[in-house]
Amino acid sequence: MKSKNLGLVDPNSTSGNNVPRFELNKLGIPDAEQYFGKVVFTGSHENAMLALAQGTVDVAANQWTSDDDSTLAQMLHKSMLKNPDGSPMKKDDFRIIHKSAPIINGPYAYNSDLPEDAKAAIAKAFFDAPAKDKAAFDRLQDGQKKGFHPATTKDWDGTIELIKFVDALRKKKAS
């Protein structure tokens, strides 16, 4: 991929900029701008896929949760990506070359001073939501999540490492 064009989403995107740079660094590419011929921000996850499909970029970073849950899958399902002849592109027209570890979502939290029965009721409401009203839960989660689970601070270790990396990048740019 050296000297090829890289499409990123937005400077403030976690899945479309910060995580890809973090992953590239782990692969021995600490400076994307020096390694790739050109690095462009496409403005959105969808635009990154369009740029890749149209050949504007050779590689693009994007959101990917699973084979069926990604910007690429959503756009292919809606026939938004086209071949030059106008026919819809297929999954086989693309190649996933790297996947990062999952990006953890922000937590739902409650005040630790709440009474224990209130804490238990809140947790139960979240954990029971997918079974109690699946249609409402699917709408709330865009059909992308299976449910909630308790988390610990250890679950955010990767995110903390990412934040430190991004902070170091910003400091390097500023100097």
Residue ranges of predicted features:
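Alpha-helical secondary-structure segments
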Residues: K2-S3, K124
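Pocket-lining segment of extracytoplasmic ligand-binding domains
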Residues: N5-P115
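An extracytoplasmic/periplasmic, membrane-proximal ligand-sensing/linker region
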Residues: Y110-S175
